[in-house]
């Protein structure tokens, strides 16, 4: 199913009036699903669910505050029950964990909430950027080696029922990695995928709408058909 990532229209989700209008416009385009990201905290889960239900829109994924995932897990799960949402997402690894000294702490810190989320019948989802393709010999983790990627440590540190990956096509490509290869490697871990293209402007890679850049989406879609992907979220 194709859905919309609301982060793209975050400027128009900061009041309940704007949120109602934005969801209706998304429904009018033909989308049947959304990911909640950067929506105003003043809009309550009950209100969000009611507005989306009226527009026949399902809420399939969120990006949630890492502190809430860590320290307010039970309440966060209940909010996702209200939203009718099974995937509780982390938008980005907090800065402090992104080193060889601290990566093991990310796995140990998020393991407990990930297990709680799984026990509630939901799944903790990790959204990649390009930073997860940095390589180093992580401290206090098994199979550490200088050429191992952060993403590989995460996949080893969390079981498939503890962590899924919201694979982002742009950011995989921005890391110089093969998007189709990583779809294949994580085929049982990617129920949600972010679709965005990449083009070049002034010698720099920049984000672009799908099919307006240089990524091979014909091959990407073919690879996704062989995976467990359920939701293609356009960003």
Locations of the language-model features?
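Acidic-and-aromatic substrate-binding clefts and catalytic sites of carbohydrate-active enzymes
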Residues: 10-16, 35-46, 64-73, 95-104, ...
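Structural preference for beta-strand elements that scaffold enzyme active sites
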Residues: 1-3, 33-35, 56-61, 86-89, ...
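Conserved, mostly hydrophobic/aromatic
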Residues: 4, 26, 34, 52, ...
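Glycine/small-residue-rich loop that forms an oxyanion/phosphate-binding "nest" at active or ligand-binding sites
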Residues: 71-105, 109
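N-terminal pre-domain/capping segments
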Residues: 1-87
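Acidic/histidine-rich catalytic cores of soluble enzymes
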Residues: 119-217, 221
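Alpha-helix-loop-beta-strand connector modules within alpha/beta enzyme cores
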Residues: 48-64, 110-117, 152-160, 217
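A cross-domain feature marking catalytic cores of carbohydrate-active enzymes
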Residues: 4-8, 36-38, 61-66, 90-92, ...
């Amino acid at each position: 199913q194709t859905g919309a990532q609301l982060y793209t229209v975050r400027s128009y989700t900061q009041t309940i009036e704007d949120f109602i209008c934005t969801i209706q416009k998304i429904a009018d385009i033909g989308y049947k699903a959304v990911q909640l990201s950067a929506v105003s905290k003043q809009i309550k889960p009950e209100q969000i669910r009611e507005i989306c239900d009226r527009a026949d829109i399902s809420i399939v994924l969120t990006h949630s505050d890492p502190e809430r995932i860590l320290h307010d897990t039970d309440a966060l799960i209940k909010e996702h029950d209200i939203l009718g949402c099974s995937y509780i997402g982390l938008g980005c690894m907090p800065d402090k964990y992104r080193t060889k000294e601290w990566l093991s702490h990310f796995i140990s810190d998020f393991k407990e909430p990930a297990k709680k989320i799984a026990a509630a019948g939901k799944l903790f989802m990790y959204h990649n950027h390009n930073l997860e393709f940095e390589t180093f010999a992580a401290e206090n983790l098994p199979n550490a080696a200088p050429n191992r990627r952060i993403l590989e440590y995460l996949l080893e540190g969390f079981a498939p029922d503890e962590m899924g990956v919201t694979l982002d096509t742009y950011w995989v490509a921005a890391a110089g990695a093969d998007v189709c290869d990583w779809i294949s490697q994580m085929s049982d871990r990617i129920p949600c995928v972010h679709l965005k293209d990449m083009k070049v402007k002034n010698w720099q890679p920049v984000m672009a709408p799908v099919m307006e850049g240089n990524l091979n989406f014909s091959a990407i879609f073919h690879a996704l058909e062989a995976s467990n992907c359920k939701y293609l979220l356009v960003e």
